[in-house]
């Protein structure tokens, strides 16, 4: 498959070098997934990505590490399940839901701008005592996402 005049093998190589997956001669990049909340009236994009929940940070919320598989047909996906902390309080409200995922180069919240943002198919809620698990292969990226 050629997309934008690029061969699939070249697309795969770009994805490996950008997201790194421990292939020979390629270091594994430390990448993390953050949860983005409702953005009324805003486009879902990097500039408006918001990890604050109902206007405040949560006491036990942390970004989760993600490791990508080797790209296939110009698409790269998470190779393992991604598990966030169990919520020690409600992470969402009736007006603030999880609508997107952001991929970051750091677990540190000083790194505010994600390298890519993915919209979820439907808004999700997380109540106290619940744990968000993202199944293997559910986070998929292609060059059109970056």
List each language-model region with its residue ranges.
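Small cysteine-rich, disulfide-bonded extracellular modules of the LU/uPAR three-finger superfamily
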Residues: 1-101, 105-146
């Amino acid at each position: 498959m050629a997309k934008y005049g690029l061969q699939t093998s070249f697309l795969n190589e770009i994805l490996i070098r950008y997201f790194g997956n421990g292939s020979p001669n390629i270091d594994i990049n430390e990448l993390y997934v953050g949860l983005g909340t409702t953005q009324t009236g805003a486009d879902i994009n990097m500039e408006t990505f918001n990890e604050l929940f109902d206007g405040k940070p949560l006491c036990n919320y942390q970004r989760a590490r993600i490791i990508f598989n080797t790209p296939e047909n110009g698409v790269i996906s998470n190779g393992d399940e991604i598990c966030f902390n169990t919520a020690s309080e409600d992470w969402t409200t009736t007006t603030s839901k999880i609508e997107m995922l952001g991929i970051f180069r750091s677990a540190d919240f000083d790194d505010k701008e994600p390298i890519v943002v993915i919209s979820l198919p439907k808004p999700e809620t997380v109540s106290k005592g619940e744990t968000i698990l993202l199944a293997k292969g559910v986070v998929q990226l292609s060059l059109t996402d970056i």
